[in-house]
């Protein structure tokens, strides 16, 4: 049995979207599991729409998700001579022909077919034409078999059959001389030795046409596996109106790559009831056998749940590095990344995304606290002056600024004043971070440090009654 060779072949006309990322992951994981080869091909034959910016964005997104190719990127735009040679081969063998029908003529044929209740398809006007008119624009069409059927075994969906009479003569070269998608993809997959084409099921209708081309060109036909689509919550095809569809948009929103990878692979594939997988587990367990045959629904809440898990269980040092980037985007430069680690530890259980964590971490760096208006109105009142004075006095005499020591000081203030915990902790929390939620009050004080803690308590007292 030959070694597995799979490919991911995006078009560089935009960013890598969720559906494309999942297709790439399925190919990547299968190649890694079977010690095969993962090829990256950039399908940039549409020169007008293809951009280097899009290529860079696709490569960046794949790198962020941890996907490295074994071969490539290979650019179709570098292979036009090969495509032209293969088209010439088909024409010389009588398997393709020039079609001089104009767009207006083709539209009339389409309308006539619709009026007669027939499926619109090219009627073969130029199929047997012997004359060659070099001064007239033309396309080149593949001479498709008109009888019989084309059947292939889809490794996800099973046997699929198309009646050849339903398929028309496919255009393989446009009037400007450029080859079309269905032609170049066959040539490339064959020339690159791709023996499994794993892609979205929106390509199923292309498959019989491509199989015909493989056979006409004398190439072996690869295996095919078509992955069901990803739908939005309303069961329509996933689009921007369902939320972000660009992979890198999720990075900007504070998602971890391992969370997105875990979620996307589980979107259509399963291994029992297991929800959370390490990269090694995905590589070991992934197979086509457990890919479902029906479409999957994108669930943002499930992705957030997974992201929360990976933040909660993540390495604080790594998360600190990532958090620094989000803080920098918010105008907060962290001189020493190590200073962020205790903040990360304090916020890991409370953060759904890194953006969420960055918003909560702002209070530890800001010179001016942004007070929650309701919290300030409730707790920064004259009746609580003695609370701040008692806590400030006790903290002034504390030299060992560690959480456990501060906890002892805090309990001492509770005992001395007779206050219940909330009556002391909530006013103090509002004074220190601007609101009533956050980590433990003593951990907040440890992270802020002695000078900043005392300054904020003093600042809160100056606001009392305002």
UniProtKB/Swiss-Prot annotation:
Annotated motif 'KMSKS' region, positions: 237-241
Localization of this protein: Cytoplasm
Binding-site residues for ATP, renumbered to this chain: 240
Domain of life: Bacteria
Catalytic activity entry: tRNA(Glu) + L-glutamate + ATP = L-glutamyl-tRNA(Glu) + AMP + diphosphate
Any one GO MF annotation of this record: glutamate-tRNA ligase activity
Single Gene Ontology BP annotation: glutamyl-tRNA aminoacylation
Keyword NAD on entry: no
Main location: cytoplasm
Motif range ('HIGH' region): 10-20
GO cellular component labels: cytosol
EC number: 6.1.1.17
Assigned keywords, A-Z: Aminoacyl-tRNA synthetase, ATP-binding, Cytoplasm, Ligase, Nucleotide-binding, Protein biosynthesis
InterPro entries (UniProt xref): aa-tRNA-synth_I_cd-bd, aa-tRNA-synth_I_codon-bd_sub2, aa-tRNA-synth_I_CS, aa_tRNA-synth_I_cd-bd_sf, Glu-tRNA-ligase_bac/mito, Glu/Gln-tRNA-synth, Glu/Gln-tRNA-synth_Ib_cat-dom, GluQ/Sye
Assembly notes: Monomer.
The protein's role, per its UniProt record: Catalyzes the attachment of glutamate to tRNA(Glu) in a two-step reaction: glutamate is first activated by ATP to form Glu-AMP and then transferred to the acceptor end of tRNA(Glu).
Family statement: Belongs to the class-I aminoacyl-tRNA synthetase family. Glutamate--tRNA ligase type 1 subfamily.
HAMAP family the record matches: Glu_tRNA_synth_type1
Listed name of the protein: Glutamate--tRNA ligase
Gene that this polypeptide is encoded by: gltX
């Amino acid at each position: 049995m030959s070694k597995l060779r799979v490919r991911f072949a995006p078009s560089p006309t935009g960013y890598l979207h969720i559906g494309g990322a999942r297709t790439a992951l399925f190919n990547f994981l299968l190649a890694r599991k079977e010690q095969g080869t993962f090829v990256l091909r950039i399908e940039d034959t549409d020169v007008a729409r293809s951009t280097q910016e899009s290529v860079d964005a696709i490569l960046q997104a794949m790198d962020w998700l941890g996907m490295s190719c074994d071969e490539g990127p290979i650019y179709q735009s570098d292979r036009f001579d090969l495509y032209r040679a293969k088209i010439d081969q088909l024409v010389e063998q009588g398997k393709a022909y020039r079609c001089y029908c104009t767009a207006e003529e083709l539209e009339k044929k389409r309308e006539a077919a619709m009026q007669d209740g027939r499926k619109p398809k090219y009627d073969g006007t130029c199929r047997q034409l012997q004359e060659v008119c070099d001064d007239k624009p033309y396309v080149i069409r593949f001479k498709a078999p008109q009888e019989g059927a084309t059947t292939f075994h889809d490794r996800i969906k099973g046997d699929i059959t198309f009646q050849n009479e339903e398929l028309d003569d496919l255009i393989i070269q446009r009037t400007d001389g450029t080859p079309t998608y269905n032609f170049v993809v066959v040539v490339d997959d064959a020339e690159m030795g791709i023996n499994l084409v794993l892609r979205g099921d929106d390509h199923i209708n292309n498959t019989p046409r491509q199989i015909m081309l493989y056979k006409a060109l004398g190439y072996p036909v690869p295996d095919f596996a078509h992955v069901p689509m990803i739908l939005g919550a309303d069961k329509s095809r996933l689009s921007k109106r369902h939320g972000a569809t660009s992979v890198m948009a999720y990075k900007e929103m504070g998602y971890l790559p391992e969370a997105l990878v875990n979620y996307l692979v589980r979107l259509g594939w399963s291994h029992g009831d297991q929800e959370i997988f390490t990269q090694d587990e995905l590589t070991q367990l992934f197979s086509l056998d457990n890919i479902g045959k029906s479409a999957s629904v994108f669930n943002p809440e499930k992705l957030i749940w997974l992201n929360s898990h990976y933040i909660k269980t993540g390495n604080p040092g790594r998360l600190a590095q990532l958090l620094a980037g989000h803080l920098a985007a918010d105008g907060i430069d962290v001189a020493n990344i190590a200073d962020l680690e205790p903040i990360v530890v304090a916020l890991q259980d409370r953060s759904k995304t890194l953006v969420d964590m960055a918003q909560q971490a702002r209070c530890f760096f800001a010179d001016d606290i942004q007070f929650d208006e309701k919290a300030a109105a409730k707790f920064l009142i004259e009746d609580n002056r003695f609370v701040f004075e008692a806590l400030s006095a006790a903290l002034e005499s504390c030299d060992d600024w560690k959480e456990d020591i501060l906890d002892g000081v805090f309990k001492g203030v509770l005992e001395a004043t007779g206050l219940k915990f909330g009556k002391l902790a909530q006013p103090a929390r509002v004074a220190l971070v601007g609101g009533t939620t956050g980590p433990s009050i003593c951990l907040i004080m440890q992270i802020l440090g002695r000078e900043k803690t005392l300054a904020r308590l003093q600042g809160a007292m100056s606001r009392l009654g305002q």
